[in-house]
Regions:
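Glycine-rich beta-strand-centered segment in the early N-terminal region that forms part
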Residues: 26-44, 54-99, 115-117, 135-138
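N-terminal Rossmann-fold NAD(P) dinucleotide-binding loop
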Residues: 178-179
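C-terminal capping/lid region of NAD(P)-dependent oxidoreductase domains
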Residues: 2-4, 232, 308-312, 323-342
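Adenosine-nucleotide cofactor-binding segment
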Residues: 168-174, 186-249
Length: 342
């Protein structure tokens, strides 16, 4: 345990390269009273990691360790740590300082894989308040899928959406957030519509319980198919991950008094090109969702401990294959999550 491998972003002329480095392993003797030394065992990627890597948002992450999502084992704890002990299996929170309550803009200054070093390293030190026990019986690879994608889906549908049995949900695409949203919605007794450009991915979604699948390459105005399927009622919830390129169809899909959880920007950062009047006319609630708090994460873990859910891991890569994993993320071929094993 002499060296800690890690990947960092290194600025090039237009974006960032991924550069492998080593550094000394943090010493347990140097832990502050409330800190824990974690051996990272697995990391998962999110679309946000592509945004940072390709510099799509113009954010300076030069020298930072990528990836917000990972899980591992506690090796040592500081003198005042009361929540954990060595050997505990944990995941880190996306926002390490957001423990509970309302979101504060200050939390943006402390996000893993952004302003703070992320999880693509062998060892990391965290305050005990930034960690959560992983679900019982889950592998590190499975648990690594949770901190961003699963928590986001949970907050969108459960805490903010108040999803009820018998309601209807539309999830866009088959990435990490959307597939967790599909799985949570089915466990909670909802009917789910899934959109994708791939019939093969839609078949996988059906196997997870999707009630209606729409290939948006074949049916660009997919809201019409959804509208007919729903008995011209619309759906109660839309998990909107596309952004400006899909927002018009999402607005046309949502029911009166419905809910749109605005989560992603897969189609870019520009403004919507359509009128927002349907939101007003249908009395729709629009929620911006940026992951969630530690309380949200722990509530979700409690749910997972009492329900059967298997994270959908599309491919696993070795640590030294990290650039290949990022390329695969960019290809958008994956269904669910991409994991890097350490």
């Amino acid at each position: 345990m002499n060296d800690c491998r890690r990947w960092i972003y290194r600025k090039n002329s237009t974006s960032y390269d991924l550069v492998a480095q080593t550094q000394p392993v943090p010493s347990p003797d140097e832990l502050k009273p409330h800190e824990c030394l974690v051996a990272v065992r697995a990391v998962s990627l999110n679309y946000r990691d592509r945004i940072q890597w390709r510099n799509l948002a113009g954010r300076n992450v030069d020298g930072k360790v990528p990836a917000s999502d990972g899980a591992g084992e506690i090796l040592a704890v500081g003198s005042a740590v009361s929540r954990f002990k060595p050997g505990d299996r944990v995941a880190a929170c996306f926002f390490p300082t957001w423990k509970s309550g309302k979101f504060d803009l200050g939390y943006h200054q402390a996000d893993l894989g952004g302003n703070l070093d992320g999880m693509l390293r062998d060892f990391a030190v965290f305050d005990q308040d930034a960690l959560v026990r992983i679900p019982d019986g889950w592998s590190f690879a499975q648990a690594a899928t949770l901190p961003c994608a699963a928590v986001t889906a949970w907050v969108a549908l459960v805490r903010r959406g108040n999803l009820q049995p018998g309601q209807t949900v539309c999830v866009l695409g088959t990435g990490g957030v959307s597939i967790f949203a599909l799985q949570f919605a089915k466990l909670l007794g909802a009917k789910v519509v899934v959109t994708s450009s791939s019939d093969a991915k839609l078949e996988k979604a059906r196997q997870l319980g999707a009630d209606h699948c729409i290939n948006y390459q074949e049916i660009p105005e997919w809201s019409k198919s959804l509208w007919d399927w729903s008995g011209r009622h619309g759906v109660d919830h839309v998990v909107e991950v596309g952004g400006p390129g899909t927002f018009e169809q999402s607005m046309k899909s949502v029911a009166a008094d419905g809910h749109i959880a605005l989560i992603g920007v897969l189609t870019g950062f520009g403004p919507p090109t359509a009128s927002l009047f349907p939101l007003l006319a249908r009395n729709v609630r629009l929620d911006g969702i940026y992951v969630g708090s530690r309380d949200d994460f722990e509530a979700m873990v409690g749910f997972l401990n009492s329900h059967q859910l298997t994270p959908q891991i599309d491919r696993r890569f070795r640590f030294e294959q990290t650039p290949e994993a990022f390329e695969y993320l960019e290809s958008a071929q994956h269904f669910g999550k991409i994991v890097i094993d350490l």
